[in-house]
Amino acid sequence: MKCIVGLGNIGKRFEQTKHNIGFEVIDYLLESNQFKLDKQKFRGAYTIERLGGEKVLLIEPMTMMNLSGEAVGPLMDYYNVDPEDLLVLYDDLDLPQGQVRLRQKGSAGGHNGMKSIIQHLGTDNFKRIRIGIGRPTNGMSVPDYVLQKFSKQEMETMNKVIEHSAHAVEDYVSNSRFDHVMNEYNGEVS
């Protein structure tokens, strides 16, 4: 079974913020496949469904971003999911807005949600989809920037990015060759 995790913060005030783009992709997958996060355990909202004919565990941690590993680690242990079958979707300040980068493994790159997952799993050997949100301009702090909602114009671009990322997840689940999925989906979304 593959495990797909979208990172974000819980609560209405965080909806459609830059930091919640991982949740947005999971929500897109849920809606387009008529799934619901109908279970809660270990501080995570989740469901187990069939996607592309394959069994998949979809998770949104309910821990707030910086503690994401506290939900992901125990749920993966409980369902006996190997870290190599994990794919995490999250925002990335170091990529321009509208760009998507898939990776087989790697460091947290300064992302506290990813640091927490790596710490709780004891490895960084899991797949990820980094979704570019760009860096703040005109002196805005990083925390203020990532917790800012997308503008209407930005949301037009990000809706395409969300759909693109969801298709990458679907292709990953049905295609065991992640390098093929990387070749297909890495880059700027237009």
UniProtKB/Swiss-Prot annotation:
SUPFAM superfamilies membership: Peptidyl-tRNA hydrolase-like (SSF53178)
Keyword Disulfide bond: no
A GO term for molecular function: tRNA binding
Biological function: Hydrolyzes ribosome-free peptidyl-tRNAs (with 1 or more amino acids incorporated), which drop off the ribosome during protein synthesis, or as a result of ribosome stalling.
EC number from the UniProt entry: 3.1.1.29
GO cellular component terms given for this protein: cytoplasm
Ranges annotated as spanning the membrane: none
Designated name of the protein: Peptidyl-tRNA hydrolase
